[in-house]
C-alpha cells in the first residue's frame, strides 16, 4: 500500500511516517480509513513489526492517526491531520531553503528543484 523504497539515507521509521503523512495530506488516505495492520505492513516491507509500531505510535502522537484497541489504526478525522502535515512540511521546507541559501545554492537552482518536484513551469 505504501510507496516506500527503503532509502538508506533515511530511517525506515521516518519513511513510514513521511509516506503516511503524504497520503493523508493528499487526501489519498481519508478520515477514518483503516491503515494496514502493523504485521501486514512489516511483512510487505520486510522489516520488524516493532519499526512499524513505533512509526504508527509517532503518527498517533502527532494526531494524524488514532488507534482502537484490538481493531487497528485509523486516519484522524477532520482537516487537522492534513493541516498538521502541511505545516510540518512547510517548516521542513523553510529549514531546507535556509540551509541552501547559507551554502550558496542560488534561486535558479531552487526553482529548478521545485519544477522537478511539482512539474513543469506554467
Question: Model regions: which residues?
Answer:
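Extreme N-terminal segment that seeds HTH/winged-HTH DNA-binding domains in transcriptional regulators
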Residues: 1-34, 40, 84-122
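Short, hydrophobic-biased segments on the C-terminal half of alpha helices
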Residues: 20, 56-57
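A short alpha-helical element within helix-turn-helix/winged-helix DNA-binding domains
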Residues: 34-45, 59
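Short, Lys/Arg-rich nucleic-acid/phosphate-binding segment
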Residues: 35, 67-75, 79
